[in-house]
Structures are given as C-alpha cells and as structure tokens.
Amino acid sequence: MGLRIHFVVDPHGWCCMGLIVFVWLYNIVLIPKIVLFPHYEEGHIPGILIIIFYGISIFCLVALVRASITDPGRLPENPKIPHGEREFWELCNKCNLMRPKRSHHCSRCGHCVRRMDHHCPWINNCVGEDNHWLFLQLCFYTELLTCYALMFSFCHYYYFLPLKKRNLDLFVFRHELAIMRLAAFMGITMLVGITGLFYTQLIGIITDTTSIEKMSNCCEDISRPRKPWQQTFSEVFGTRWKILWFIPFRQRQPLRVPYHFANHV
C-alpha cells in the first residue's frame, strides 16, 4: 500500500496549523531550557524524564504532520462498483459522483471523503477513514505532552529544589516568569480544548458514529448492529494489535472493506 500525499490549499487552515506548530515549538524549546536541563544538571530529576518528554514530542509532531498530509479517503472520479455492492453506494448531489454510504462531501476541500468525521482546520485536512487513526493519536499525544509540560511547570515552582546555577544574563532566565506564565496559559487552554475533542472522538468510535452523523441526527445507527468497542477501534486503526494503535510511524491496513478500495486506501 503506497502513501498518498494530500495537501489542502486553505490559508485559514495554514494559520491554524501554524499556531499549533508555534505552541509545540514554544514548549519543546523553552520547557527543557528553563526546567528540565537545569534540574537534571543539579541532580533533581533523572535523565529518563527528558527522554520521555522528547519522545512524546516527536510522536506528537509525527502524528500532526501525517494527519495533515495523509489522504483522508478521497474518492476517485470513476470508482469501480461491483454489482453485488451497488446497494451500498449512493449519488452525491454536489459532485454527482457515486460514493459509498456514510461518505460526505466536504465543501471546503470540494470532494467526497469516505466515512468523513469532520473537516479540522487545526490539521488543515479532513478527518476521514484513512487518517482518523492519526488524528486520534494527535489528540492523545497532544494531551499527554500538555499534561507533562504543565506538571513540570508546577513542580519547577512548588516541588523541585530551587536552582542554584542560573545564568541570569540569558534571556530565558531574565524573563522566566513571563515565559512560564504564557506556557501555562497555552497549556491549560490546549488541555481543556483537546480533552473535550478527544472525549467526543472516543465516544464516536465506540458508538461507530461520525461527528457529521451526530450533527445531522442520522438514524442509520438504529439499523446498524452495534459492534464491540475492540472491533470499532481495530477498524479505525487498521490492526487488532493494540500496541500498534499508539505508533504513528506505520502504514494503516484497512480492516473495513465492504467495498473494493484496496488501491485507494
């Protein structure tokens, strides 16, 4: 299965994603500079905590980049529909193309996406069948990284021993309080927003319902049999191996194939 790169030309989305990258860079540069490395050098924390911080940061960035550039499940212009599966397809009244049921036409991107959940400006891309798992990983690692950074910011002032060796000639130490206050504000704001989003995403997967279906009061779930949560998560992540649900470096293998899209997934 080849990786399909997908770019959305949207200045609003670029600004939103740029803000996310700025927050990530702000924390990945300043938190270690002000908190982690000084306390490590004075023996207050073990080095493994710094490795964990950078590990979570890398996973978060990889999930962000891949969720942004991975094709969410754009439908081809002339799909081949097997005769036995035509009942599972419908005609889009906006682009006049045949699409599998539960697909949706994204007005911002201008095409239909398989099992589209929503269009997310923060990744400048749709969240659909092929990149939903990356979006979930992004939510998870963003929340984990935010909690980690807030925890160290709190411990820096209220738990760790005061630093004895600080070069006050450096900008970051002269303006430490302002920098840490801004980091705490961004962290709390990010944590509140991402927690609500992550919760709704998990509920949607457990109930096998997309955000668009919830907003449109779709009644398909009445006729659709309820699946075990392990099955719905396995379909989203493309594997039944739960440990792989947390790895953003791999390729997703589709488990949900009610229609023939092996070379489009």
Swiss-Prot record:
It is a multi-pass membrane protein. Its EC number is 2.3.1.225. Pfam families: DHHC. GO terms for molecular function: palmitoyltransferase activity; protein-cysteine S-palmitoyltransferase activity. Widely expressed. The chain crosses the membrane at residues 17-37, 45-65, 134-154, 186-206. Residues 90-140 form the DHHC domain. The DHHC domain is required for palmitoyltransferase activity. The gene is ZDHHC21. It is found in: Golgi apparatus membrane; Golgi apparatus, cis-Golgi network membrane; Cell membrane. GO terms for cellular component: endoplasmic reticulum; Golgi apparatus; Golgi membrane; plasma membrane. Residues 38-44, 155-185 are extracellular. GO terms for biological process: adrenergic receptor signaling pathway; hair follicle development; nitric oxide metabolic process; peptidyl-L-cysteine S-palmitoylation; protein palmitoylation; protein targeting to membrane; regulation of establishment of endothelial barrier; regulation of leukocyte adhesion to arterial endothelial cell. Palmitoyltransferase that catalyzes the addition of palmitate onto various protein substrates. Palmitoylates sex steroid hormone receptors, including ESR1, PGR and AR, thereby regulating their targeting to the plasma membrane. This affects rapid intracellular signaling by sex hormones via ERK and AKT kinases and the generation of cAMP, but does not affect that mediated by their nuclear receptor. Palmitoylates FYN, regulates its localization in hair follicles and plays a key role in epidermal homeostasis and hair follicle differentiation. It comes from Homo sapiens. It catalyses: L-cysteinyl-[protein] + hexadecanoyl-CoA = S-hexadecanoyl-L-cysteinyl-[protein] + CoA. The active site is at residue 120. Keywords: Acyltransferase, Cell membrane, Golgi apparatus, Lipoprotein, Membrane, Palmitate, Transferase, Transmembrane, Transmembrane helix. It is an enzyme of class 2 (transferase). Residues 1-16, 66-133, 207-265 are cytoplasmic. PANTHER family: PALMITOYLTRANSFERASE ZDHHC16 (PTHR12246). Belongs to the DHHC palmitoyltransferase family. This is Palmitoyltransferase ZDHHC21.
